[in-house]
Amino acid sequence: MRQLIPTSAEVDDAALIEAYRLPPGRWLRCNFIASLDAAVTVNGVSAGLGSPGDRRIFHILRALADVVLVGHGTASAEGYRGIEADSAVGRLRTRLGRPATAPIAVVSRRASLTTDSGLVTDAVSPTVLITCAAADPVRRAALADAGVTVLVCGEDDVDLRLALDRLAELGHEQVLCEGGPALLHAALAAGVVDELDLSIAPALVGDGARLLPGALPDVARLELRQLLEEDGVLFTRYVLAPGTR
């Protein structure tokens, strides 16, 4: 892997960890992979665009995060499970002196997470459900009884700014958002995104979900802070420009 910006050099795992490590404090980092025509899935999942380098960065970002934020649709489509202590991410977290596991926080306006989901039954760190007051109270109560940490953030829709406040109150300040596109769009529209880590795969897909499903209220301006390359895949790290967040 070559780092192109700020300098050109080979990057090993230790250097890659330092390249993505954040200073203490609250931060919302969004991590996506997309094709050259901005498709984020092939046949409904992101794996068709992935690469070994993308997987390395995926592991590192999860290892550095306090919590992983994901929309319910993406969690279902991608078969999300909890982070296990003996997984590659769990072992890396341990080497970095962090707790071996971290919770998954699922965003669902309707509290659509089911009590028999692997995110509920198999989670080592209790899964967090971020929903709103309009969601079925019976479903919310059942999930809470099953061990899910239920956060009601907003009345008729999820208030992401409030959700991040609530996560911070639980000690989860550095948040890694893994999608999907609707959640990224909502977070950008709410002005809560600090960073976008976008892997650009050298492929053209032609259909499937796109990085953003629609127009934003205002154009989001970003500043390129880092660019790496491996096997033709570009790994970008953008920070939202002042005034955008």
Spans of features found by a protein language model:
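Enzymes that bind and transform nitrogen-containing heteroaromatic metabolites
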Residues: 1-245
